[in-house]
């Protein structure tokens, strides 16, 4: 019953029109580097915030995986997942100089899909 209620609570929050603006605003508020690319990542990872079988039921916009527990990270709300992304992913960007953020994502192996960056750029160009 708990999972159903969580899913129902997410539906009104993640309506396509307002969500991208809200997520982008929060990315900037939390000082996430390359916020528009990261916004595109959240869209790609959640299927425009409409996935049925992904990490969205855990308020996880980025599909961040807990390798110790073999499950998606759970966040109390979607804004916390942005903080999780910043701490879990972007701290590595600051440790080394990269040509660009797409290169960084490829180098750290962010996604297993070999076409991830191409898909990400297509979404980015639609924003």
Question: Predicted regions span which residues?
Answer:
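Generic cytosolic/nucleocytoplasmic N-terminal low-complexity/intrinsically disordered segments
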Residues: 1-2, 91
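Basic side chains
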Residues: 2-3, 119
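Sec-dependent N-terminal signal peptides
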Residues: 3-15
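Catalytic cores of secreted/periplasmic lytic hydrolases that degrade extracellular macromolecules
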Residues: 15-127
């Amino acid at each position: 019953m708990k999972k159903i209620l969580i899913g129902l609570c997410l539906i009104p929050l993640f309506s396509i029109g307002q969500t991208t603006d809200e997520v982008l605003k929060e990315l900037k508020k939390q000082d996430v580097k390359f916020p528009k690319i990261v916004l595109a990542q959240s869209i790609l990872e959640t299927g425009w915030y409409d996935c049925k079988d992904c990490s969205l039921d855990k308020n996880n916009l980025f599909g961040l995986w807990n390798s110790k527990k073999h499950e998606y990270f759970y966040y109390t709300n979607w804004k916390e997942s942005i903080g999780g992304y910043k701490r879990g992913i972007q701290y590595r960007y600051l440790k080394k100089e990269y040509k660009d953020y797409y290169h960084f994502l490829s180098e750290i192996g962010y996604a297993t899909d070999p076409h991830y960056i191409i898909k990400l750029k297509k979404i980015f160009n639609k924003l």
